[in-house]
Each structure stands twice: as C-alpha cells, then as structure tokens.
C-alpha cells in the first residue's frame, strides 16, 4: 500500500510538512512523497517524490497548491504504468530526518513567515539569498 505524504521524506515527516520548509528557509524542500505505509510515520520505502516549480511571487499557499497539483499529475502517470504491469524499485529511506508533530506548530511560526519575510521566501530563494542544500529526489516519471 502507498501513502501520499505532503512533505519530502525523510527530511520533513509528520504534520504541517509543507509549512516547515518555509520556516527553515528551504522552500525547495516543499514537495510530496509517495511511499510504502509502515508503522513509523512517513518512513516507508519511497516510490516517487514530486516538487513544484518555484516562481517569483509564490507564497507558502501557492507552493502548497502547486505541490498537490504536480503530485496528482505525476501519480496519474505512475498509476497508468502500474496498471500496464510496470514494476518500480522502491528506495529505502536512509535517514530519519525530522518528525514534526502537530504540537510543534505554533501560530507564531506562521507569523514569522508572514511578518518577518512578508511571505517572500521563494523570491529570496530564487534570488540566491538563502543558499542552502538541494534535495536528492527519487523520481520514476
């Protein structure tokens, strides 16, 4: 069985995982992960990861909507291939990343994104002001 997790596992697992990449100034880590269901939250072997194209002017909610849209489109393609009998190799998660709980999120976190950064974190990232790491994604389409 597969789960669609709205976050990039293993880096952002658990709750509000389209928010936390913005809080940590990593909007390029906003994405979705298709993975096997396991007892540990969002820790199953990965089939595919989707990330949206980031564009100037995108805010946190734009990126969240784009993530759902691209994950849906890519899942359709994956499902069509599964129906035709294609088998995919799954990639075991090599690290635990961070498991975020609902209790971790406070309204002050969101105020920081809006008040301190004026919801322009994507703009800062695209301008090269934030630097940072780049996720190595598992992709099958």
Language-model features: locations:
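Internal anion-binding site segments
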Residues: 94-141
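Donor/substrate-binding cores of folate-linked one-carbon enzymes
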Residues: 1-111
């Amino acid at each position: 069985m597969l789960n669609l997790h709205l976050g990039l596992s293993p880096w952002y697992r658990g709750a509000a995982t389209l928010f936390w990449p913005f809080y940590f100034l990593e909007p390029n880590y906003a994405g979705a992960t298709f993975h096997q269901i396991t007892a540990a939250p969002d820790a199953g072997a990965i089939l595919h990861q989707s990330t949206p194209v980031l564009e100037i002017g995108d805010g946190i909610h734009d990126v969240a909507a784009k993530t759902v849209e691209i994950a849906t489109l890519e899942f359709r393609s994956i499902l069509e291939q599964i129906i035709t009998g294609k088998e995919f190799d799954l990639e075991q998660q090599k690290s635990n990343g961070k498991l975020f709980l609902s209790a971790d999120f406070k309204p002050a976190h969101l105020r920081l994104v809006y008040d301190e950064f004026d919801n322009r974190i994507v703009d800062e990232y695209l301008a090269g002001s934030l630097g940072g790491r780049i996720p190595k994604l598992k992709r099958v389409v």
